Amino acid sequence: MTCPVLDIETWFLQWDKMWGYEDYGSSYLAVTGCGPTCLAMAGYYLTGDTNMTPDRIAKFAQRGGYYEKGYGSSWTLISEGAGKLGLTARELPLVKQKMTDALEAGNPVILAMGKGDFTTSGHYIVLTSWNGEAFTVNDPNSRIRSSQLWTYEQLENQIR
């Protein structure tokens, strides 16, 4: 089974000059803004709402208490905050088939990543397609990692 590539042309980078130097928590969006940036990518893709930008989602996250000092964005920004933005979010079990089913249905999948290829501590990424063998990823912090294909086995032990 292959899934169409979700047309997430709005691949936002957290360090984009348009918002990278906006305050987010104890630092800048460029440094700690992967959560709001991923939610902005998914939200913009799903709704077409041009107000779904990383800086606006970051402000929403801070006002809503979704930023945890010393950590960054709480998972509740995705699991609960998305609903307050008019989106529907649901948590998936760590099962490849569930992820590919979501993509096949046209839904981006936001993953919280632990130490590994994407981060030394914590990071959010967006799965955008499955070609039957590997996923494509929108990494808000890396053009290089976003241009690679990732097998489930490569990602599995890094997903929190």
Residue spans of the language-model regions?
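Conserved active-site-adjacent core of cysteine acyl-enzyme catalytic domains
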Residues: G43-Y44, G48-R160
